[in-house]
Amino acid sequence: MDTINDLFSLLSNFLWGWPMIILLLGTHLFLTFRLRIPQRKLLTGIRLSVKPDANAKGDVSQFGALATALAATIGTGNIVGVATAVALGGPGAVLWCWLTGIFGMSTKYAEGLLAVKYRVKASDGRMYGGPMYALERGLNMRWLAILFAVFTALASFGIGCTVQANSIALLAYETFGLPTWLVGIFVCLLAAMVILGGIKAIARVCTILVPFMAILYVLGCVVILIMNSDYVWPAVELIVTSAFNPSAAGGGFMGATVMMAARYGIARGLFSNESGMGSAPIVAAAAQTRNPVRQALVSSTGTFWDTVVICAMTGLVLVSSILAYPDITFADGAALTKVAFSKIPYIGAPLLTFGILTFAFSTILGWSYYGESAVNYIEGRRINRFYRILYIVALFFGSIINLDIIWNIADCMNALMAIPNLVALLLLSGIAAEETKKYLWANRLDDEMEED
């Protein structure tokens, strides 16, 4: 087993090395300029996300689709991942993470656009879409579409299911002393109540859970920043200067280089917002929307909230806390966020614990739909119920077993998902540009599209 784990670890490191980072970041930059900087319409996207398009075709509201995508995206990576990036790459990693989110918005925009453009209406009236449908219907590459679906289904049992259940069980054990098997049963029952209801039930829960957990976490960050008010601006200066001159950080960050700051900041940003991975457009295709561009704008806001807001807030909290409290150092590594939140009297540690628990549970819900849509593409609706039950059972086993090998396999599957998705994005970028010109730059966002 150790040999297999080592092999997947090597494969994961290779797949998520500089070639993948350059490919993803290059796609972000290419689409930003190919689509004429759609980030300029951020406020329009935010407005559309909270404005129901009830008469349009689709299964869930645009906000429901966004909330479900955010449920799967906003996870422990926003908390632990940023801390790891700062510990390994220095304060400058925060700026690189933030910039990755800014440019990643264009990729998430293109993913949402193509998802709606090539979605299909099943016999039961439900909408299905995502990279697999764009690859098949837009590029006639069904073989690559099937590969994407297989990688997505496998990834759903890893990063979306067992890994999250394990995080919840271990945290509940460490914090409250609860047996992992008992926590596993509870998570299974709670998840079953939502997942067995399908996308409408998942979206309904996510529209309540996601805003609540995100606002609560951000408020916690704001409290810490108020406590560290004298160090906030110095932290901003340190983040900016050390991104290009790590020696400016001094102290324990002296070992960091510009390459390390960029490497860990960019990688964490890419992991965090999933722009380019191809997962979020699966639920974007289910949105009630009049045309592809409306949902594309809404989808792009997901990267803004996840990386530009939440990851940036986490980074600012960490760096300002290191400056404010001499007992907090980069050596705390992944525990940096926990140490920083512990400075809030009485409620700091419980608040962070609750945040991690809800982030992990919401990821379970979002990824269950991604995996179900993938197996539905391969085998049809007859396997949906079986997949849901298998996913719920896997949650229990995830809570009680060692998951080192699962982490490495999940990382590999996520990288392998990205490759077919990036092929679709780059080869169909001309279509995305045409649709953007037709609806967005011609001010025709209220026009209806023709759907098959």
Regions found by a protein language model. Name each.
Residues 3-4, 34-39, 77-82, 158-169, ...:
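Transmembrane helix-loop junctions in multi-pass membrane proteins
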Residues 27, 31-32, 100-125, 131-195, ...:
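Helix-loop-helix module between adjacent transmembrane segments
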Residues 32, 111-118, 222-238, 246, ...:
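Extracellular/periplasmic helix-exit of transmembrane alpha-helices
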Residues 56-88, 114-132, 136-137, 150-153, ...:
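Alpha-helical membrane segments and immediately flanking helix-loop junctions
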Residues 103-111, 185-199, 210-230, 263, ...:
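Selective recognition of specific alpha-helical transmembrane segments in multi-pass small-molecule
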